[in-house]
Amino acid sequence: MESVIFSINGEIIQVNKEIITASPYNLFKRIQDHHLKDEAIILNGINYHAFESLLDYMRWKKINITINNVEMILVAAIIIDVPPVVDLCVKTMIHNINSTNCIRMFNFSKRYGIKKLYNASMSEIINNITAVTSDPEFGKLSKDELTTILSHENVNVNHEDVTAIILLKWIHKNPNDVDIINILHPKFMTNAMRNAIALLGLTISKSTKPVTRNGIKHNIVVIKNSDYISTITHYSPRTEYWTIVGNTDRQFYNANVLHNCLYIIGGMINNRHVYSVSRVDLKTKKWKTVTNMSSLKSEVSTCVNNGKLYVIGGLEFSISTAVAEYLKHGASKWIRLPNLITPRYSGASVFVNDDIYVMGGVYTTYEKYVVLNDVECFTKNRWIKKSPMPRHHSIVYAVEYDGDIYAITGITHETRNYLYKYIVNEDKWIELYMYFNHVGKMFVCSCGDYILIIADAKYEYYPKSNTWNLLDTSTRNIEYYDMFTKDETPKCNVTHKSLPSFLSNCEKKFLQ
């Protein structure tokens, strides 16, 4: 029986010539055409045992592929050009891909040009980017590869600070490619992380590129009323799905988002005032009743800053209150601030540079009902008066934008809506063009380049150009609307001294 001799890494294997003759694969066809009997055919880059497995497949159409031998069989199948075995090996590798081996499989797929494996391993890296940073091979990704990964719309980061920590870890291994930092969008980062990057001597250039990472975009939480029960829904920009988080039966409450939790504050249940505060985790959907406020009240004003929920003013039965207090997320005790100069409810409160500004609302007692234009600022542990609003307004909504305050007024006794800008450094109010009119209740959110207003319709206001954009979207039955980013960055006053500790804590928090 004639044989064909193969030499693999110095080892000899003889193959029945009938197997070679019957083979439809390219390598063996060429052997049939050109092989001289007495010559040993040298095969380079192939494992001896993998070649034996391929011969078994050609004889019996069966092959034993495991996670331990799949790579060497796949290499042999690619070199010898046995497409069915290539497909079986690729399927095995894709089936067994995970966060601990996806970078190795990614590199393997590039080396041998295996598109399906490349796509699957890239997808695994994108879905597990925070985990794969612990792989020693992570630092060997090229600048272009990491840019592609972190620019993917579905990369699994939920805040731009996470992207920053991933980049800083990679830059530590690739100090000549620090300009990769320019893929960051500073407006989505916390002040602490921006300060940390500046202290490292890195500069993020201003970019006009669109934001591609869906996970860092604003999440949305909406409460809609229906037959005395309000439904809470949450929209994730990464999954692009709305999910029902829970329900509440309160009226005249206020709400705010802090550390990925929605707080429902005060209000009334069955026409009775309450001082309880409920919290729902928007990720786990678990509810918790947190420590009660100091008194029963509704129509409070709220704002959040530095991991704390601030509750200001409100209506205690029929009397407006001057009480101001805050609760640190995860704490069990409310801390009282000095009382407001003027008690009020349904006004607006907003933080600018760690100072609280409170404006408008109603001062009421059993004998009085006064619509306010007063503005107060809490700074250096005391309330001081600021320039009043141009008009008296019972309902005010306000947001901070680029260091100033933009206030939009609702309607109760007023005849129209107004838009104002308060220039903080000049203590000065100016009136701006108002696009819509005759709207009572609304919600206002600062969204990077624009301010979003949910009123009788959805509006975008662009402060830099003083222009409006109307979005054709239903806003019926909305009781609460807010946009937020998932901020889990450790709180820290970042200095040269605290920088190493801050970055270490961020890495422990973000990269698993």
Swiss-Prot record:
Residues 102-176 form the BACK domain. It comes from the Viruses. Keywords: Kelch repeat, Repeat. Residues 2-67 form the BTB domain. InterPro entries: BACK, BTB/POZ_dom, Kelch-typ_b-propeller, Kelch_1, SKP1/BTB/POZ_sf. Kelch repeats lie at residues 216-261, 262-307, 309-354, 356-403, 405-449, 452-498. The keyword Repeat applies. Gene3D superfamilies: 1.25.40.420, Kelch-type beta propeller (2.120.10.80), Potassium Channel Kv1.1, Chain A (3.30.710.10). Pfam families: BACK, BTB, Kelch_1. PANTHER family: KELCH PROTEIN, KELCH-LIKE PROTEIN 8. Belongs to the poxviruses Kelch family. This is Kelch repeat protein C2.
